[in-house]
Structure formats: structure tokens, C-alpha cells
Amino acid sequence: MGHCYSRNISTVDDDDEIPSATAQLPHRSHQNHHQTSSSSSIPQSPATSEVNPYNISPFQSPLPAGVAPSPARTPGRKFKWPFPPPSPAKPIMAALRRRRGTAPHPRDGPIPEDSEAGGSGGGIGERLDKNFGFAKNFEGKYELGREVGRGHFGHTCWAKAKKGKIKGQTVAVKIISKSKMTSALSIEDVRREVKLLKALSGHSHMVKFYDVFEDSDNVFVVMELCEGGELLDSILARGGRYPEAEAKRILVQILSATAFFHLQGVVHRDLKPENFLFTSKNEDAVLKVIDFGLSDYARFDQRLNDVVGSAYYVAPEVLHRSYSTEADIWSIGVISYILLCGSRPFYGRTESAIFRCVLRANPNFDDLPWPSISPIAKDFVKRLLNKDHRKRMTAAQALAHPWLRDENPGLLLDFSIYKLVKSYIRASPFRRAALKSLSKAIPEEELVFLKAQFMLLEPEDGGLHLHNFTTALTRYATDAMIESRLPDILNMMQPLAHKKLDFEEFCAASVSVYQLEALEEWEQIATVAFEHFESEGSRAISVQELAEEMSLGPNAYPLLKDWIRSLDGKLNFLGYAKFLHGVTVRSSSSRPMR
Ligand SMILES: Nc1ncnc2c1ncn2[C@@H]1O[C@H](COP(=O)(O)OP(=O)(O)OP(=O)(O)O)[C@@H](O)[C@H]1O
Ligand SMILES: [Ca+2]
Ligand SMILES: [Ca+2]
Ligand SMILES: [Ca+2]
Ligand SMILES: [Ca+2]
């Protein structure tokens, strides 16, 4: 009971509610907001455009504890408050049913990329060019029928193709009104939504894109008609609880779409049961993801900062305004939780209460029906709902999790491997030695995933060269990947041109310390790793050198002293663990993680 009334929450004062009238501040934020505000006490790493992962903790918000961010947005984007207040019922069933019955928008309102409401983000009086360059003859090609769905930004109708390749076929047409495009940014959003639908259309769990048109009043997006309705309706129809086998079948489809668009460098930002549709009413209907209206490109070396999404599904780091693809994984964690137990993991009477809950409360895994749900399923959900985005599984990893592994339609390349390998090959020899020792202690389960990724990269003579990484990425590239500039990472992997990674070293390179640390066996793993390090990787290191290794300044020296053994000048166990973790002075001394 009381899913969100955890101990954490009850310590929060009630006066930090987000005032619902802080709407539409003209406040400007910029891409680096989070970094700049948290960098004051943390020395920055040498001038690279990369985000230093060690400097970013989801717990280092520039905001006071419990306070959700101000509505500062990407330039010109307004934050619309309040969105429909959540109903006080806890089980998703009742809450959703009520909302559907009453509100004109039957669903959880998204935290919108605002497109309605007066004013223009590009400056008052500016004339907006609402010409998209799309074809104009929609009416000549399609016959419009009844409405099949409605959202905040448009409505979707049934239609029939009158001519062309799909003549006679029924389709869905999302009609987006130009009158709602009141800023250059909202026009850009529609342009991007169409571009993404088109680029990602090939995947079996993406809705198929056919065509796009416009006239003076509307944009018409023609796509595959999904006649089975929304996943939300199906959740409501069966009382909100799925047997594990069925939950798995749904999640595998959600994750395989997500792994695909994440590999393209696209973050959806609005994953929720309303945005998944079944192709038919049949038992074996395929699930498709729709609505890329809030989606964006996620460059590998940048973090997004606009607070968008739907309150119940929004990840903590989104509220802290520094996030990337992991935010979608959190939303899938929320969906998983709902599928399995029928309740929301994070709940509150008001939007700010929901946000506090998301930031601080631990979801309830103790009350009914959780005792009857398998421990492995619970483990799965927990590894998606980790508040630290670095400790969360990726979509590709989630597909390889033992709970889902058997259902698996085939593993997908995980871009996070590229990021980790890139860091590894650019790291100091000392750090690489530390990681090599760690790789010898990786649990069997995690090795299964790494082996699969190794094979997907198609090693030659038992090892991976730079061109294997290039070829693999190219194989899966769509226009979206080009736009998100993920392949740029290959330039930073140049040191690999003269090297070959065998499986052992690949493991050292692509193991995520953060994820291992989230495991119950971490202590044990670190102990074994340290033994290896002692016998083959360690050497004496000075405090200064260690500080440099960790991109820390002289103010860290006193702390680092405790990590080095006076006996032989080598790292002690604590030092080794901290070094692996890459902890910042701030989070080690005053803000313990978790
Ligand atoms: N291809 C489709 N086939 C059948 N129904 C669809 C299709 N696309 C959309 N719909 C229906 O129309 C609804 C609204 O579509 P969509 O989510 O794309 O619009 P939106 O205005 O962006 O919504 P939101 O308010 O969630 O942002 C969907 O929830 C769904 O019920
Ligand atoms: Ca909707
Ligand atoms: Ca939608
Ligand atoms: Ca949308
Ligand atoms: Ca953006």
C-alpha cells in the first residue's frame, strides 16, 4: 500500500509544491545548463566536447531537494501548466477510467512541447512559414473516414487509398492542424515528427509510414492503420494485470522497437501505454510504437534538457534536465510495473507530488500481487527503474535479461558499447589495467550479453578492429542515425585502428562499472577484481597522479590519500573501487550515492 508514501516522501515539506501558475516563463535555458551549474565544485576534464560521465550525477540537481525544475525550456518553448491533475485513485485502472470519462483529452496529458496557446516562441509578430513542402493533393488520393483517435496535437482518422501503390487499402491519417503551430519551434517539431516516422518506418514494431501531405490548414500523415487499439485500452480491459508470459510478450516488442530507435540516436520521450497500438484485435497482434511528436535526436556526447513527457512516466534525470536515451528505459520500467501489478509505481495527487515521488520514492515491490510475481521479473523491473540512469539497463541489455531472454526475437547492437569502448581506448594505461582486472570478475549473466554484442560486431581472427565497429553501425544506419550524428563516435575511436580487441579485452572495455555496482554481488565482484589488480595491474601511484587520472584538483588530495596504501604506495581496496567508479569529490565526501 501507499506506493509513494515511503519514508523518503514523508520527510518532504509540503510547501515545495510547484506553483501551478508559473506558466510560460520566457526563461531561456541552454544545452549545458546542467553541466555549468554543477561544475562549480567539480574540476572539468580537459577541453573535449564530451560530457564527462563522472561529473554528472542525477542527484546533483541545481535545484533544492524535492523541487521540480522551473519551466525553463529550450529557447522559446513554453511549459504549459497545469496539465490535467492526476486523479487521487492509486490503481491505474480507476484513475485512468475516471479520466477517460471526464476530460476532453482522455489521457494523461503530456508535459507538452507546447503547440497550442497564443504567442510565438520566435518573437511576437513574426510571420511563420507553415509551408512544409509536402505534396498538396491529399484529397485526390485518399478518402477520409471516421475518427479513430485523438491526442493533444491532432486527431487520427481512418482513410482509404484511392490510387497509387496501396490503392484500396485502409490507412490511418494523423491530421495536425496548422492553427496549432504557433511558433517556429512547434513547426520544427512537426517536421521532425514526420522525418522520424519516415526514417524509422522499416522496423517491425514501428508504425509503417506511407505518405505525408499538407494543405493550407493541416498536415496529413498517412500511415499503417493499427486496428487493435491502444495498449492502454487493453490494460484497462483486463483489469490492469498481465500474467508474466503476456507481459513479457508485450515488453519484448516495446524493447525491440526502443533498442532500434536508440541505436539510431533517437529518444522517444513519451513512451506510455497510449502510444503503443496493436495491429489487430487478434490474440497474436503485433505491437507498434507511435507518436514521435516529442522525440528528439540524442547525440552521443550531449545531453538533452527540455522537460517533456508524461508525468507518471517521466524519468528523474529528465526533471533534473540532463538526460538521454535512458529516460525512455525508465518509462518502459513504469510500463512494466503497471503491466505486472496493475498499479502505478509513482503516484501523487498533484503533478508536483508525482515528481517528488519519481525523484525520491522507491516503488513498492512488497504488497500484493508482488509476492506472487517471480523474483526474476521483479529484478527486471528494478533494473529499469533505477534512479541513477547509469545503472539502468539499456534496451538491448533488457532484451538479454534472463526474464526475457527466451522470448527474444534476436539481439540488437547496443550503442552504449560504442561509448564504453571509446572511453576505454582513450583511457590511461592505469585505468585500462583496473578495468581489465574488473573484467575477470564479471558475473556469468553479464558475460552472456557481452558475448552477444561481441558476435554482433563480427570479430575477425577472434578480435575486433575499428572497421568491425564501422561496418556494424553502417549495417543498421537509417537517415535518423545520420542526423543524430552517432557515427561521429567512430572518429574518436581511431586509436583502435592499430589495435585489436580480443573478447577478454572487449569485456574490459565494454563493462559498465555503474551497472555492476548496482548488482547485489558488487562487493564480491570488486573483491575478486581487486585481487586480480593486485597480482597483475597495480603499481605505486602518487596522490597527484591519481588526482590527474580522475580529473580532480588539488582540493581532492586529502581525500585521495586514504585510497593509497602507505606501505607500498599502491591503491588499497577502497581506492581501487573508487577509482573504478570515477567518483567525484563531492559525491564521495558529502553526497553518498543512492
Ligand atoms: N496508425 C494508427 N492507427 C490507428 N490509430 C492511430 C494511429 N495513430 C494514432 N492513432 C490514434 O490516435 C491517437 C492520437 O495519435 P497520436 O498519439 O499520434 O496524437 P498526438 O496528438 O500526438 O497525441 P498526444 O496527445 O499523446 O501527444 C492515438 O492515441 C491512437 O489512438
Ligand atoms: Ca492520446
Ligand atoms: Ca500520443
Ligand atoms: Ca504526441
Ligand atoms: Ca531539442
From Swiss-Prot:
Binding of Ca(2+) 2, residues: 500, 505
Binding of Ca(2+) 3, residues: 538, 545
Active site: 270
Compositionally biased tracts (Low complexity): 34-49
Residues where Ca(2+) 1 binds: 461
GO molecular function: ATP binding; metal ion binding; protein serine kinase activity; protein serine/threonine kinase activity
EC number(s) on file: 2.7.11.1
Description of post-translational modifications: Autophosphorylated.
Entry-linked PROSITE patterns: PROTEIN_KINASE_ATP (PS00107), PROTEIN_KINASE_DOM (PS50011), PROTEIN_KINASE_ST (PS00108)
Membrane topology reported for the UniProt record: Lipid-anchor
Family the entry assigns: Belongs to the protein kinase superfamily. Ser/Thr protein kinase family. CDPK subfamily.
Protein name as catalogued: CDPK-related kinase 6
Phylogenetic classification of the source organism: Eukaryota, Viridiplantae, Streptophyta, Embryophyta, Tracheophyta
